[in-house]
Each structure stands twice: as C-alpha cells, then as structure tokens.
C-alpha cells in the first residue's frame, strides 16, 4: 500500500482580486476532493485547507501564505505534497498528472 499523498489548498474566505467570478478556495477544495475520490476510489489521499490569514504553526505553510498575501501567487493555491500544481483557477488535469506520478491510477 502506498503512502497517501497530501493535497493542500491555500486560500481565504474572499475571492482573490484577480479571480473574480471564480469559485472560492473552499469551493475549490470541495470540488477537488469530490473529483479525486471519483477518479481514484479506494486509493486514499489526505487533504488540508489552509487559510492564508491564519496558517498553521508550520514554517512552510506560513511562508506560502505570506507569498500569497504578497501577491506572489494567486489563490486558491493547490499543492500535491510540496509541489505547486495550480493557482487561481487550478486545472484538474494538472492535479491528476501529479497524483499519477505518486502511483495513483484511474478507476476504469
């Protein structure tokens, strides 16, 4: 059994200024979770939502949250393990490709 990968979605309650008419970060989190469970059933993964205004007590998370607040990245920012796979309007295809690099296989 492979180790479940960690997907992180960074964001805030409000939609980013450059992302008007896009889903919120929490909506993106829920959408990603549902899509991944359908694509990779019985293949566990972990997900975490990180509020950029109240990141956990973890240097990496604090650093990324600060970069987002400083407009170095758009949010929602999506990571698979520690690799950024999407920002602003993440593409499922990019998330799937990274998941498959970690051994996940499509439900057929």
From Swiss-Prot:
Gene3D superfamilies: Hypothetical protein sa0798. Pfam families: DUF1462. This is Putative disulfide oxidoreductase YuzD. Keywords: Disulfide bond, Redox-active center. Disulfide bonds join 16-19.
């Amino acid at each position: 059994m492979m180790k479940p990968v960690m997907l992180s979605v960074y964001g805030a309650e409000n939609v980013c200024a450059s992302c008007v008419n896009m889903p919120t970060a929490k909506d993106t989190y829920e959408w990603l979770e549902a899509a991944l469970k359908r694509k990779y059933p019985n293949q566990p993964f972990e997900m975490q939502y990180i509020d950029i205004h109240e990141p956990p007590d973890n240097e990496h998370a604090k650093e990324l949250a600060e970069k987002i607040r400083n407009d170095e990245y758009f949010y929602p920012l999506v990571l698979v393990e520690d690799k950024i796979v999407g920002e602003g309007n993440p593409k499922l295809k990019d998330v799937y490709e990274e998941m498959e690099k970690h051994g996940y296989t499509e439900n057929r």
